[in-house]
């Protein structure tokens, strides 16, 4: 399940592109998530009123939250699988406060892959996509284990 050094390098190379515009990438990821899986929008009280893509693109709050999401994910990815300290508070809030099902983390992972591929096709070919998929799968597996420890079976 772990990634090789080369795979982590592919993940971190494309992540460098993401960090140049975390808010923009994050906004695109959330829009993709909400359009592809409208049920996920119900978990976000402050975004429920955003019904169209135009509304979502105009929302500074959505952009800020996208920045927050990708900043947290970047910190986790940079740990190359040694992310327990970063994962613990994230799992705690997502399991107990927000009650975000693991399935929704799969949905946002798909959105991340799509956005990275559409925004960075040269840097995000098949090998990089495969590596990022593995990294996101590792993240989901580990957060699911934390959810279980917390008694949340979402």
Swiss-Prot record:
UniProt lists the gene as MB
Q: Which residues carry this modification: Phosphothreonine?
A: 68
Name a single GO biological process. removal of superoxide radicals
User: A cellular component term (GO) from this record?
Assistant: sarcoplasm
- Compartments reported by the entry: Cytoplasm, Sarcoplasm
Q: Say which enzyme class the record assigns.
A: oxidoreductase
What the entry lists under PANTHER family is as follows: MYOGLOBIN (PTHR47132:SF1)
| Name this polypeptide is given | Myoglobin
List the catalytic activities from the record. Fe(III)-heme b-[protein] + nitric oxide + H2O = Fe(II)-heme b-[protein] + nitrite + 2 H(+); H2O2 + AH2 = A + 2 H2O
- Top-level taxonomy: Eukaryota, Metazoa, Chordata, Craniata, Vertebrata
Q: Which UniProt keywords apply?
A: Cytoplasm, Heme, Iron, Metal-binding, Muscle protein, Oxidoreductase, Oxygen transport, Phosphoprotein, Transport
Q: Which PROSITE patterns match?
A: GLOBIN
């Amino acid at each position: 399940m772990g990634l090789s050094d080369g795979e982590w390098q592919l993940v971190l190379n494309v992540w460098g592109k993401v960090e140049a515009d975390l808010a923009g990438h994050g906004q695109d990821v959330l829009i993709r998530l909400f359009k592809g899986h409208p049920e996920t929008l119900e978990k976000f009280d402050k975004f429920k009123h955003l019904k169209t893509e135009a509304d979502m693109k105009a929302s500074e709050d959505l952009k800020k939250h996208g920045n927050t999401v990708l900043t947290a994910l970047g910190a986790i990815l940079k740990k190359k699988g040694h992310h327990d300290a970063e994962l613990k508070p994230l799992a705690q809030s997502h399991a107990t406060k927000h009650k975000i099902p693991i399935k929704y983390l799969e949905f946002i992972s798909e959105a991340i892959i799509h956005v990275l591929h559409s925004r960075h096709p040269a840097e995000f070919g098949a090998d990089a996509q495969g590596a990022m998929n593995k990294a996101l799968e590792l993240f989901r597996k580990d957060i699911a284990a934390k959810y279980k420890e917390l008694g949340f079976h979402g």
